[in-house]
Amino acid sequence: MSSTAGQVINCKAAVAWSAKAPLSIETIQVAPPKAHEVRVKILYTAVCHTDAYTLDGHDPEGLFPVVLGHEGSGIVESVGEGVTGFAPGDHVVPLYVPQCKECEYCKNPKTNLCQKIRISQGNGFMPDGSSRFTCNGKQLFHFMGCSTFSEYTVVADISLCKVNPEAPLEKVSLLGCGISTGYGAVLNTCKVEEGSTVAVWGLGAVGLAVIMGAKAAGAKKIVGIDLIESKFESAKFFGATECINPKSVELPEGKSFQAWLVEQFDGGFDYTFECIGNVHTMRQALEAAHKGWGVSCIIGVAGAGQEIATRPFQLVTGRTWKGTAFGGWKSVESVPRLVDDYMNKKLLIDEFITHRWNIDDINTAFDVLHKGESLRSVLAFEKI
């Protein structure tokens, strides 16, 4: 066991004291893990739009003060009573979608969701209903069961997977959310077939992972859609066959962008993916799916209280509207395989990293994210 096992650890963390305010670098206290919990020394964490979504006040489940972060990687520091699958020194990736392998969801091959700790996780607590984080005597909430914006975090043992110790932790931290989500939406949720046509709304990290998945699936046409044309080069690198800026399309009066797409692309696409979280582009994506068999997958998370709309005729005439969480991967068993795919050069990760920062620069990383200038910023807790 480590020298800190069983003790409270003082460490650095980026704390969100309230919504719509910069994160504050603080020294926090992290309590030892309880039964079926694992304390992890986080080495790397990435900044994701989901973190920004909560920090910006759009998350209906958003709780403050909180330690955000859900894409990360690190090394097990200590384990709680009853933990058999992990030991100090293991290289691990925290998982915001757990996998207990016991609940009715885990046993159902149709879903990758797990409900065992859903309520406590949504409430910002560990499974026993309490927090392991304090700062100056004040309790801090956990986030998505991960809280990777802390040098040490505590997670449930069903919210963690052990990965190949040869894999670079900086890189595989990204498999905790965005890349896995987009890639899996293609391969698992929609099962895109060879020769299919695909359109992707939003060319951030998730959208590019969708494109990567579509290329791997053998799609013959992959169209990237975004308002920021500087993203087109990356989209084509990952496999897009062409890119469109909707603002550059001259639409006849009364014609929608999706109607134009249907005209231009032989009745629409076999598969469409919305990776923005905008209810209007969700409708566009559905209505650009091919009549009779087109499938549209929602990946982006819309703001609290927003609703999607379309005419029922769009669905009656054979289109399917579906969504995905974490790309349909059953997390504990799948992420280690994705790491192996990366190590065997079947999966790109390095190319998603556009910025590297120290944790002290986390607010700059969020600024770059909001400006659309980054795919993934990776932050290190040790000086780089």
Curated annotation (Swiss-Prot):
Binding-site residues for Zn(2+) 1, renumbered to this chain = C48, H70, C177
The record's remark on the cofactor is: Binds 2 Zn(2+) ions per subunit.
Name by which UniProt lists this protein? Alcohol dehydrogenase class-3
What is catalyzed by this enzyme? a primary alcohol + NAD(+) = an aldehyde + NADH + H(+); a secondary alcohol + NAD(+) = a ketone + NADH + H(+); S-(hydroxymethyl)glutathione + NADP(+) = S-formylglutathione + NADPH + H(+); S-(hydroxymethyl)glutathione + NAD(+) = S-formylglutathione + NADH + H(+)
SUPFAM superfamilies cross-referenced by the UniProt entry: GroES-like, NAD(P)-binding Rossmann-fold domains
Cofactor(s) essential for the protein: Zn(2+)
User: Where is the protein found, in the record's own terms?
Assistant: Cytoplasm
Question: What species is this protein from?
Answer: Caenorhabditis elegans
Q: What taxonomic classification does the UniProt entry list for its organism?
A: Eukaryota, Metazoa, Ecdysozoa, Nematoda, Chromadorea
Pfam entry (one):
ADH_N
Q: List positions binding Zn(2+) 2.
A: C100, C103, C106, C114
Record-stated family: Belongs to the zinc-containing alcohol dehydrogenase family. Class-III subfamily.
What is this protein for, i.e. what is its function? Class-III ADH is remarkably ineffective in oxidizing ethanol, but it readily catalyzes the oxidation of long-chain primary alcohols and the oxidation of S-(hydroxymethyl) glutathione. Plays a role in the calcium flux to the cytoplasm in the ASJ sensory neurons upon removal of a nitric oxide stimulus.
Which top class of enzyme applies to this chain? oxidoreductase
EC number(s) per entry: 1.1.1.1, 1.1.1.-, 1.1.1.284
**Transmembrane keyword on record:** no
Single Gene Ontology BP annotation: formaldehyde catabolic process
